[in-house]
Every structure is written in C-alpha cells, then in structure tokens.
Amino acid sequence: MPAVQLLLLAGLVWGAGARTAQLRKANDRSGRCQYTFSVASPSESSCPEQGQTMSAIQDLQRDSSTQRADLESTKARLSSLESLLHRLTLAQTSGPQEIQEELQKELGTLRRERDQLESQTRELEAAYSNLLRDKSALEEEKRRLMQENEDLARRLESSSQEVARLARGQCPQARDTSQDVPAGSREASQWNLDTLAFQELKSELTEVPASRILKENPPVLPRGEEGDNGCGELVWVGQPVTLRTAETITGKYGVWMRDPKPTSPHTQETTWRIDTVGTDIRQVFEYDRISQFVQGYPSKVYVLPRSLESTGAVVYAGSLYFQGAGSRTVIRFELNTETVKAEKEIPGAGYRGQFPYSWGGYTDIDLAVDETGLWVIYSTEEARGAIVLSKLNPENLELEKTWETNIRKQSVANAFIICGTLYTVSSYSSADATVNFAYDTGTGISKPLAIPFKNRYKYSSMIDYNPLERKLFAWDSFNMVTYDIKLSKI
C-alpha cells in the first residue's frame, strides 16, 4: 500500500509539471483494480519506431562516452592538482637549511653572471681606452706631418723667391772662403740668417755666419787627448756599402751602431739597431755577430724604460745614450744591467722640432762619438739656430765644454764628429750630396768643404762615425750602409 501511495504521489507531481498527464483506474481481467497514468512526450508527437529507438540509444551512448571522457579529463586534472598540492606541502614542510641552500645556489649564479658582465665591461673599457690612445697618437702624428708640410711649403716658397732673385743677378759677391769670417764683418751683415733656402743653395760656396757665435778666445782641445791615434782631417768618403735592408715600414728611418769602446760581454762585432718610426720607441735589437745582423736574427731585444726620440742615439763604453722623447733630456742606459745610470737636461736645447736637421724627424738633439769621447749636437734660442757642440762626461752626462759654431743647423741634413772636428752633410735626399762644412773645436775655426757624399737611396736620416772601425754608419731609406773614409795627416 505505501508503494501505491508513493506511485500516486509521483504521478501527481509529474502531472503538476505536465498538462498532458492523465490518471486512470480500471479492473483487470481477474477483477483486480489497476491505476495507470500517462504523460505526453515533450519532443515526440508519437511513439518512435524501433529504428528510432536504436538511434536514441546510440545518442545516449555517445553522450555517455563524452561524459566519461570529460570525467577522465577531470580526474587527470584532479590528479595534477593533487601532485601540485603535494609539492607545495613538501615545500612548506622543508627545513630552512634546504631553502637557504637553494637561495645560495641562485645567488652564486647571479654573482657569476655579474662577474661576467663586469669582465665584459672592463674589456670594452680597455678597448675604448686603447682606441683613444691610438687616436691621440694618430692626431699627434698628423699634427707633426702637417707642421713638416707647412715648413716644407715655406722653404719651397722661399727657395723659389731666392732662385728668382739669383736669376736676376742680385746674388751677393762671393769672397775668398778659405779665410775665417769674423762675427762682426760687413760681409756677414749681407746674409739673412732666417732664410734657410738661401743657405742651402750657397752651402757649397761659403759658410753662413751668425751673430754672437764665435768667441774671442775659443777653448782649445788639448792635443794630449788625441795622442798618436792617426787623427787628421776628412778628405774623402767612399761609396756606400749596403749591409741590411729593413723589412717593414717601421724601418723607413732609424739608427744602428757598434760600440767603439766595447765592454764584456759585448765585442766590436756586436751591433744594435733601433727602428724609429712610431710614437713610442722602446725596442733595441742586439746582434752578437755581424752575420746575425745581416741576416736579421737578433740575439736579444731590450725594452727601454722610456721612449727615445728620433735617430740621435749612440752606444759607447757599454751604455746606450739617447734623447728622451718629448724632452731635452739625455739618458744613459747601461746595457749589461738594463738600468738607467744617468739623466741630464741639456740647458736651452731645442727639442720636438724646434731646431732639427733639414730632413726633420725631431732631430734636435744628436749624440755622437769620436776618438776623444762622447758629444751632443744641438742648438738653442741664444745661438739663433746655429749648431752648438758640447763634450759630455760619459758617466754622469755633465757638460764639460761647449762650442758655438757658425753653421745653421736646419740648413744641413746631418752631422758627425771625427777627431774633435764637426762635419756636416748638405742634403739627405740628393744622390750627389757633399760634406759641406767643418768646424774644428781645437781652433774654433769653420770652413766650407766639397767632399762628395752619395745618398744612394735618397733619404739619409742618420749618419754617425765609428772611431774604432774608421767608418761612417748611415741609415738611408730602409737601408743600413757604411762608408769608408780617408783622413789627411795632421
């Protein structure tokens, strides 16, 4: 009975939700009372056939499969969430030490990255600094070349004007050049000391006097210092003999030498070479034997503690003597100990292109060696650009004696000293130049000469005398050459 009541209640509820629901009661064939109710389908106007029933069942199966797939996907997501929750739970339950270790690892990684960035920054800064230095060096070289170009242009213009004047027959009359010219003579007043081109044109005819040059009582070089050493006056210079040619552009001009007073372990064969093209000249190449020098195999390379200037260096009694770059200071560098033993500023000496030889190259201060010792050739404002000679103490570089000549330094290409006498060369680029002046420190007298001198390669940037070998050493446009000489008897 309760089941019947529940059935009736369900029918009533369904009937309340559907207008087509009907409740009927009737006796069956056996006389029992039966209650029935019917509800109209909301989407079907009539009962489906058997095929339609199967289609509906298939639709239900598809829906069931879809729901099952959704359920599996939901289960997978729930599983993933459970795994994540488990990891979070483990992380929360981990001790502070584990967390600290993880943080330390991360911090170490960040530090390594920071160090790498700082290293890259330093490398970039160093590269930038190098570029700035190279730029400064190039600008300095550019300024120097522009200055030389301006000087050459002025000299060319002056030479052209002087040639035109000479062509018009306005040249002053030449006088007897065998006599010394007093500083205050009338003939001297006819010369313009500031016109370099004129002096070069007339250098083979007469000396060029400068005011306040010759002293009334010039110091005399003691003959006892010379002794019987075969000294005499230069009368002949032979043809150049080429020993070696520089391999690179840095060998355009330079200086090479041997020690006329060698000290152990060096011998009279030991040769030194310095390429002087560049802004920071520090390398000195040493060759134990002449054959090594000719073949280009140095036995040692010195690195100077300070850059040298131009081509005026010499080696004497085991030390290299050179002008410090950008200064009027002469430096003595002892080769055996590779240390600086003495430095001396030459009072009033021009430097950095103030009073160079005619070829330029910052050749303001030129060191030289002869039978009597160590010399320095330079000029000063007081001498108005005329060559000044000073005898140097080879130990401490103190100036022992000084002579002022009447030869304009910028009017000659180079100079060397033999037996206490200064000799100058007329041109660095003419194939047929001359040794055109001589100044005797023993008498204080200068005179013109005309001894042929060959510039085979037409760019002689260095000429020095070696008293031990009685030869001239020269650097002529990448080529290292020697000249035999002859001296007359005194």
UniProtKB/Swiss-Prot annotation:
- Predominantly, its location class is secreted
SMART domains, from UniProt? OLF (SM00284)
Query: Which residues bear the site annotation Cleavage?
Result: 212-213
Tissue-specific expression: Detected in eye aqueous humor (at protein level).
Bridged cysteine pairs (disulfide): 231-419
Sites where the protein binds Ca(2+): 366, 414-415, 463-464
**Modifications the protein undergoes after translation, according to the UniProt entry:** Palmitoylated. Glycosylated.
Q: Which InterPro entries match?
A: Olfac-like_dom, Olfactomedin-like_domain
Q: Where is this region: Disordered?
A: 168-187
Q: Which UniProt keywords apply?
A: Calcium, Cell projection, Cilium, Coiled coil, Cytoplasmic vesicle, Disulfide bond, Endoplasmic reticulum, Extracellular matrix, Glycoprotein, Golgi apparatus, Lipoprotein, Membrane, Metal-binding, Mitochondrion, Mitochondrion inner membrane, Mitochondrion outer membrane, Palmitate, Secreted, Signal
The subcellular localization recorded is:
Secreted; Golgi apparatus; Cytoplasmic vesicle; Secreted, Extracellular space
| Residue stretches in coiled coil | 55-170
GO BP, sorted A to Z: bone development; clustering of voltage-gated sodium channels; ERBB2-ERBB3 signaling pathway; myelination in peripheral nervous system; negative regulation of cell-matrix adhesion; negative regulation of Rho protein signal transduction; negative regulation of stress fiber assembly; neuron projection development
| Highest taxon, organism lineage | Eukaryota
As for what it does, the entry says:
Secreted glycoprotein regulating the activation of different signaling pathways in adjacent cells to control different processes including cell adhesion, cell-matrix adhesion, cytoskeleton organization and cell migration. Promotes substrate adhesion, spreading and formation of focal contacts. Negatively regulates cell-matrix adhesion and stress fiber assembly through Rho protein signal transduction. Modulates the organization of actin cytoskeleton by stimulating the formation of stress fibers through interactions with components of Wnt signaling pathways.
The record describes its quaternary structure and partners as: Homodimer (via N-terminus). Can also form higher oligomers. Interacts with OLFM3, FN1, NRCAM, GLDN and NFASC. Interacts (via N-terminus) with MYL2. Interacts with SFRP1, FRZB, FZD7, FZD10, FZD1 and WIF1; regulates Wnt signaling. Interacts with SNTA1; regulates muscle hypertrophy. Interacts with ERBB2 and ERBB3; activates ERBB2-ERBB3 signaling pathway. Interacts with SNCG; affects its secretion and its aggregation.
Report what the protein is called. Myocilin
- Give me the gene this protein comes from: MYOC
